Amino acid sequence: MTIDLHCDLLGCVEQEPKLHFEHPDTNCSIPQLLQGGVRLQTLAVAAITCPGSTGVTQRQVALYQKLLKEYPSVAPYSAYHPTSEKLHCIFAIENASGLLEEGEPFEEALKRFEAYQAVEKILYVSLTWNQENRFGGGNASAVGLKRDGELFLEYLEGKGVAIDLSHTSDALAHDILNYIDKKGLHLIPIASHSNFRSIKDIPRNLPNTLAQEIIKRGGMIGINFVRRFVGEGPQDFLDHIHHGLALGGEDALCLGSDFYGGIDIPFSLLPERSLPVFQEDYSNASCYPRFLELLRSVFPERVVQKISYENAYKHITANISL
């Protein structure tokens, strides 16, 4: 059994007319997820910061409702049970610009958040994507936390929704942690789809200080399968996991594949050297049995099971009520 913290199936289908929920070019199609043994998949509702971002989110939420209606093999998180053979899904908001455009009153974000929570549980929210927005700085910037970001963190207090640091600048991530402490907020930081900067030095990966803060605060770190974030071969996956364990992350490491395919964003923003996006043997969601065998060749079964599903399951069930 596998639990995955991040894929872009909804964004693939929303942005590319030729794709659908069973299309293999998504790299996270329903058949691929089921073949990979995924029993709980976090579906990112993702938007870039631009005019119309809230409409993108609205369309992706509608696609999720269509998915549940048309595919009997897929069920909502509210129906999740570890013994079920169905694929269960939960939401995440990747970039709060999908809840609020740059010129709108702040209160509109809260209305939209509550409306989407009524459709499906939201596991986590990222304030930003790559760029700066009204909430703070994304991973391609050096901007920290802004006032609207502070207000949104306060709003999330006690709602059982994690705050995702995978697409923050380092400054924003540190500001978020400091603001949580300053206000005494019950808000758990995670990195849903990031690896370790000590192994692969790119901004989307975690520096040791942030990784250790996430671990210390009971959060999750989802291992990302994008080649540019991992490295060129299987050994690079193992190196990231070894590093995470050395930082004390045995109970924090999870899977956060970031599988997607065939869409203009983020492909159009990637440098040419980023292609192919994934390693050949680990290029779509059906690869999980093979990936877990790779882990078993090095790590004890206890660690493999924690990474595969136990850590994510414990976090989700402890922080989100059915």
Regions found by a protein language model. Give the residues of each.
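An N-terminally biased module of ancient metal coordination in phosphate/nucleic-acid-related enzymes
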Residues: M1-L43, R273
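Conserved, mostly hydrophobic/aromatic
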Residues: H6, L33, K121, I163, ...
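Active-site beta-loop-alpha junctions enriched in small/polar residues
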Residues: H6-L10, A46-I48, A92-A96, T128-E132, ...
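A metal-dependent hydrolase metal-coordination microenvironment
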Residues: T26-N27, Q32-E108, N130-G149, E154, ...
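Glycine-rich tight-turn/loop motif centered on a GG-T
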Residues: T54-T57, F106, G137-L151, K159-A162, ...
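Histidine/acidic residue-rich metal-binding segments in metalloenzymes
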Residues: E107-V119, L123, N139-A162, T168-I190, ...
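Short acidic/histidine-rich active-site segments
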Residues: F225, G248-L270
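Mid-to-C-terminal alpha-helical segments outside catalytic/metal-binding sites
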Residues: Q279-L322
